[in-house]
């Protein structure tokens, strides 16, 4: 039996047997998980999602999926705490129990992905937030949760791994091209083995430590952040403070909303892409500041009636003193259409291209030009349960097997 189908069947059977499928049950849960004190001056609420995901592929696991074999079942429990005191102080936290931040076949574990305190001025013109939380860059991060994201996976800029390692800089052009696997002379299985060492332009929501200031003035929104790690940093170091604040990452976004239909934004970020532990291996005169990732991005969104559209464009430059400043360009366009109050479908086009770098008398691309199309129907059974399906077809230039296919499903229970 398909593990996803069996898990969903068991869950739905449990809900039916206990009379939980009705909205009255979820209303009781919401009431039981909500608290207030001091005449409602202090309010707190616990909420969460249960995600049951299944993936099937016939090649090296795509994106940020880490597993042997060609099928993966990935359950996840996410718990959220929101607390507010008066009109000016707010705190939130997110804890997860799963097999790792990204889908994998490892054992289960628990961790805190987010925790932060926020001060809001009168009118919301100025907000100050301190803690561990998602990046302000782009427009996908605010809707990356399993309930809000119409797809199972992230757009290409957030999960396509490039030939940049965070544990060591490339020492030569030859080494960088070997890491990118654009040459067919690599060892069998090397691409899968090295997968955990590589980085994307931005790793998902990038839950890093730091502080941000943001607000809204008329039709304009602004956000500035100072974080302990760059956008491409790996999840296991997002909470690290070891020698991080000597080389912080600075990011920003300016948004403009001329009317309720359109929303535009420009983002930027700059910081080192290497871990501080790499610094002792540098040659004299070199430092982490010489190995920077600089990102410029633009985004837009459109919403009218049953149609929603999102798009983002990313340009990233990685400074590698022993090679060159290598650049990549990535974008996606995503469309969601609601056919009925419960059924909607989504279509996403993704593409990433890599610049050429000097390679002897020639110039060679330092990565595989890639395009991918994602198709995702979804059905929302109730305001608390939904099922999403996804098919992705991806093509890479210079890959041993150019084409790859991904089938994914995700059942989400929200409470």
Feature annotation, model-predicted:
Residues 32-56, 67-232, 246-251, 255-263, ...:
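Outer membrane beta-barrel
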Residues 25-26, 58, 64-66, 105, ...:
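Outer-membrane beta-barrel pore domains
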């Amino acid at each position: 039996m398909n593990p996803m189908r069996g898990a969903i069947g068991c869950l739905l059977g449990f809900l039916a047997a206990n009379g939980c499928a009705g909205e009255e049950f979820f209303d009781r849960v919401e009431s039981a998980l909500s608290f207030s004190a001091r005449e409602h001056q202090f309010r707190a609420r616990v909420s969460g999602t249960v995600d049951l995901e299944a993936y099937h592929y016939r090649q090296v696991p795509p994106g940020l999926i880490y597993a042997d074999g060609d099928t993966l079942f990935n359950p996840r429990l996410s718990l959220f705490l929101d607390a507010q005191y008066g009109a000016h102080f707010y705190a939130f936290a997110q804890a997860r129990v799963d097999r790792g931040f990204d889908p994998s076949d490892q054992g289960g574990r628990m961790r805190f992905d987010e925790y932060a305190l926020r001060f809001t001025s009168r009118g919301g013109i100025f907000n100050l937030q301190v803690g561990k939380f998602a990046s302000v860059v782009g427009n996908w991060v605010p809707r990356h949760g399993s309930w809000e994201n119409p797809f199972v996976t992230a757009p290409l800029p957030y999960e396509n791994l490039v030939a940049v390692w965070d544990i060591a800089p490339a020492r030569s052009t030859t080494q960088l091209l070997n890491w990118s696997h654009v040459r067919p002379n690599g060892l069998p299985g090397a691409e899968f083995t090295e997968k955990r060492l590589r980085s994307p332009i931005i790793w998902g929501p990038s839950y890093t430590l730091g502080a941000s200031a943001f607000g809204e003035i008329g039709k304009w929104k602004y956000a500035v952040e100072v974080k302990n790690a760059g956008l491409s940093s790996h999840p296991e170091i997002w909470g690290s403070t070891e020698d991080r604040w000597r080389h912080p990452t600075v990011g920003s976004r300016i948004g403009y909303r001329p009317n309720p239909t359109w929303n535009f934004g420009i983002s930027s970020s700059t910081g080192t892409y290497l871990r501080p532990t790499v610094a002792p291996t540098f040659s004299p005169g070199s430092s982490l500041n010489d190995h920077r990732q600089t990102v410029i991005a633009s985004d837009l969104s459109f919403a009218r009636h049953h149609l929603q559209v999102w798009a983002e464009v990313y340009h990233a430059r990685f400074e590698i003193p022993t090679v060159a400043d290598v650049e990549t360009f990535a974008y996606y366009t995503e469309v969601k259409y609601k056919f009925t109050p419960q059924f909607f479908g989504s279509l996403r086009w993704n593409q990433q291209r890599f610049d050429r770098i000097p390679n002897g008398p020639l110039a060679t691309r330092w990565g595989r030009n890639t395009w991918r199309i994602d198709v995702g129907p979804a059905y929302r059974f109730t305001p608390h349960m939904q099922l999403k399906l996804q098919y992705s077809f991806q093509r890479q230039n210079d890959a041993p097997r150019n084409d790859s296919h991904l089938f994914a499903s995700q059942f989400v229970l929200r409470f």
